[in-house]
Amino acid sequence: MSGFNPLNSPLIASSSLSLKEAYYLEKLSLKKGFKINYKLSEDSLNLLEKSDLCVLFGGFSNACLNENERWILESINQSKRPYALLRPLQDTRDLQENCLFASYEIHTEAAILALILRGILEKTSQLKGHVLEKVDVGYLSSEANMSEEELQELIALIVKAKKRALVLNREIAKHADNAFLYTLLSGLQNYLEILHIPCYDSSATTAFYDSKDQEWLLKTALKEGVLPFKSQLKSKDLELLERMGEANGSFVYVSYKSLETPKLSFSKQFKIANRIQHSKAGFQILDKTLECELEESPHLKGLIAILEGAFFDAYPYIPILSHSQGIS
């Protein structure tokens, strides 16, 4: 391990880490409270350049890109390759001609991964006898609020491509049920190369996790009581797909952008639902009350606002508990 002790210091890790390493680092990060910044390696950039298709799972809001997201979008757009963007936030600024965009319901990442894996298995004639054969596609699509047509279009793109990359953001890494997500990803990594890119500020970090440290990582995780994720899906795991949390009310999407005064950008629908009438208000988000500047944006849709200037190292969609103008 180069730098200092990662159990109480920020840490840089490569975007091309194995699923096992990323999982244990994220669990230890949550347990010990240190931040992880994933850095795009040269290998990762080469992989992206050689991919016929990139599936971007989460993030990539042009209103507030992090350094990894910016590099990836530049790489894709220079070559005009097709890519897919999957996330709950709906922002028309992010809809490019070469982009297949599909939104889904907050907290339903497991359903989306299961549907993608099942779709690939079906299209490649490998579904018969697989655990996911029993999954009700209509039910899961409905729970995730993604149409079966959008799903079929996405699966067709993936199967058609010869080299594919799946780029994981905070929606996966910081998810409360990420053990199950990593089990699903274990199946998907047979069909897509997987990269991890959550990054707040790698320039401010000196400690670097290297794959040579894997033995130390596994020992530390065991010592800290971190349970491993299952490498293969079992029938009883499908129960987890029926217990996904519901996302009711209004949410903020936490951006990486730094501002002196926090700013909340939102849709007309959000403004009406939350009875917003002024240019500033105090919002309670997790354990903080933030005095935010308010701005209606014609580009945004739905009940998810973009929060800039107040970073939470967590799953990026956070419910608004209350605000000073009487949100319920």
State what each model feature region is.
Residues 19-22, 66, 110, 174-175:
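Loop/helix-junction capping segments adjacent to catalytic residues or to phosphate/diphosphate-binding pockets
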Residues 32, 100-234:
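Active-site phosphate/pyrophosphate-binding segments
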Residues 20, 25-36:
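Long, structured ligand/cofactor-binding scaffold of large enzymes
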Residues 3-5, 9, 14-17, 25-27, ...:
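A cross-kingdom feature strongest in bacterial/archaeal respiratory oxidoreductases
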Residues 37-145:
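Glycine-rich, acidic loop regions that bind phosphate or pyrophosphate groups
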